[in-house]
Amino acid sequence: MKRWLLSLWVMLPAVGCFAQAWSLSTNLAAYADFGTMNAEVGYALGRHWNAMAAVRYNPFTFTSDDGPMQNRQRSLAAGARYWPWHIYSGWWVGGAAQAQEYNRGGIRSPETREGQRYGAGLSGGYAYMLTPWLNLDVGVGFWGGIDRYSVYECPVCGLTLGKGQKTFLLPDRLMLALSFIF
């Protein structure tokens, strides 16, 4: 009986132990892009793989002497990352399917472009462990796909200069992110 109780007492703390399977992060560099709010959630699928879902949102329009400036967007992405050494630590490479609705104008010229983009992206980077629960992620990514757009003379006038559809290849992320691992 004493051995059984001792065994139970030794093994009981292991019942509450879980691996760090989830991550929640925000890209600090994206806030410099006219205040684009963002979040990414990841789940460990194994030692080397995790699935992720990300969202970016920017509803802001700023006023300058030349008129309104905006880089408004709503973006969704879903994908996976491969970690050669161990999940949430070291180098990684990833891919994602993405969709974006955007309205950008008044930044370099009064011309405004809005539309929808659909495509896929590749990214890579490095996760530096600050603590067992907090990472600093640095990375870069590109994405390409189809862009359906309209071009307007200015952000508020509504005079259409053109419409179209084209393929694109654009930088997607310049990442300096804080990730909470739990």
Protein language model regions, located:
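Residues that define the transmembrane beta-barrel architecture of outer-membrane proteins
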Residues: 20-22, 33-37, 70-76, 114-120, ...
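Gram-negative (and chloroplast) outer-membrane scaffold detector with strong preference
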Residues: 43-138, 177-180
